[in-house]
Each structure stands twice: as C-alpha cells, then as structure tokens.
Amino acid sequence: MKLSTLNETTPLVFNYANYVTPQFVANAVNVIGGSPIMAREVAEFSDLVAVSDAVVVNTGTWRRAELLETVKLIQIANQTQTVVVLDPVAVGIPSRSVPVQELLTNSKVDIIRGNAAEIAWFAGIDFASHGIDAVGSGNIEQIAQLAANKTGAIIAMSGPSDVISDGKTTRVLPVNVPLLASNVGTGDALSAIIGAFNGDEISLDNTVRAMAMMKLAGLTASHQVTTPGYFANQVLDELYLLSESKLETFIAKEVKKYE
C-alpha cells in the first residue's frame, strides 16, 4: 500500500518481538500511521491475529522452548491469510538455524528481512557473519534471488545496499546510511514497517516502499545529527514527518532494477 493508504487504514501489526527493542519497534509502527501490538501470550494468539493485518516474528532473543508457540502463531496467521514477516536474527548460528528450519517446515512465512549473512543462510550459501552485522563478499542480488526461490518468500535484505527480491524481480536501493547499523532497533523496526506496508496485499512494491521509508528517514536523520543516541530519536521523527510525495520521489530516483 502507499503511505497515504497506510495512514488512512492504520494497519494493526502484531509483533512477536525480542526483549531488546520492543519500545522502539512499537514507536516506529505508530509514527508511520500503524498500530502496534506487542504480545507473547499463547492464549491470546487467535484473538489478536484475528484483528491484525500483519504478524512479525523476531527471533533475536528466541528461546528453544518458544519454537512451538511461534509455529502456532504463524500457523494461525496462515489460516487467516495474514501476512507473516520473519526477522531471523543470527540464523546462521547452528543453535538458531535448526529451530528456524523447523519453523519453516511447519509453517509459511511471506517475507524474510535480514542482513546479507542471514539471507545467505536461506540461500544455502556460506557468508561470513559477526553478530547481527554481516561481512563478506558475494553477489548480494543473486543471494537474495536464490533465497527467495528456495523459501517462496519475498526477501528484504538490508545493509549498505538494500536488496528486495521475489525470485523473479529484484530491486536494489544502493544508499548507504552507516548510522542505521549503529542502532540495533532500526532493523527490528524495519521488519515491523514491512509488515505494516504489506497488511493489505503482499507484494514486492510494498516491501520496497517499506525499505525505502526507513532508508530515507535514516538518510535525512543523518543530515541532522551525527551520534547514535540522537540519531535513533531523529529517525522516529523523520519517519513521522515523511510525506508520500517525498517517499515516492526517493523510490523513483534511487531504487534500481537488477538485471
């Protein structure tokens, strides 16, 4: 959906969040015009998914014991045809990759948002990883395409250059905002924003809009402040102030089609 539609419809985003950044994530959804729900109580899943437009699962502080309840949550979303966004933090680590694979085997996710190392795992490619950040070399566009084809999900790879692919069509946003990597909450918030934009229809274009919104907000914020603490708050302000016309102009100018 476009930003004006998002503002008019106020999509409700159910976040199965980590324990580190839930307030920042909730604020980000709120300032763009959505409505956040932050919940983990299994008994509430059916009722909350029934009124939600998107479900976002973040595995950043996931415990193995939570696998079954996460699968149940996504299965409920699948039954109601509610978009599911997966943020598979550090999935390349074996203790995390095994439960994520079990999750994918038993439920369906529509969009996967991660850094290059995380997305490479879904593509079956060895890509150097260090914590939540990714380092290494390789054709990130091809990695995203392969991951999309293997999972059947839209891939939203965030980094110095963002890559969005459904396996057939791939878009690249080559705008680097280093300060975005200095705040762990911006990636988590991005996943939730992706959920909000895809609440009415799952599409590559809606995912591109979400990625571009965070990148443009970060870029504008970096022109206002230069330190991480102030930057995080400024990003929220820029998300709030961003107009549809500025967002669409930014997309038209900066987003490239990968051939």
Swiss-Prot record:
The Enzyme Commission number assigned here is: 2.7.1.50
* Cofactor needs: Mg(2+)
Q: Which positions bind ATP?
A: 113, 158
Q: Which GO terms describe its molecular function?
A: ATP binding; hydroxyethylthiazole kinase activity; magnesium ion binding
Q: Which residues bind substrate?
A: 38, 185
Task: Name the GO terms of the biological process aspect.
Answer: thiamine biosynthetic process; thiamine diphosphate biosynthetic process
Q: Which Pfam families match?
A: HK
Q: Which UniProt keywords apply?
A: ATP-binding, Kinase, Magnesium, Metal-binding, Nucleotide-binding, Thiamine biosynthesis, Transferase
Pathway assignment: Cofactor biosynthesis; thiamine diphosphate biosynthesis; 4-methyl-5-(2-phosphoethyl)-thiazole from 5-(2-hydroxyethyl)-4-methylthiazole: step 1/1
Catalytic function, reaction form = 5-(2-hydroxyethyl)-4-methylthiazole + ATP = 4-methyl-5-(2-phosphooxyethyl)-thiazole + ADP + H(+)
Q: Which InterPro entries match?
A: Hyethyz_kinase, Ribokinase-like
Give the main EC class. transferase
**Tell me, what does this protein do in biology?**
Catalyzes the phosphorylation of the hydroxyl group of 4-methyl-5-beta-hydroxyethylthiazole (THZ).
Member of which family? Belongs to the Thz kinase family.
Q: Which NCBIfam families does the record match to this protein?
A: PRK09355.1 (NF006830)
- Supply the name of the protein: Hydroxyethylthiazole kinase
What is the organism field in this record?
A: Leuconostoc citreum (strain KM20)
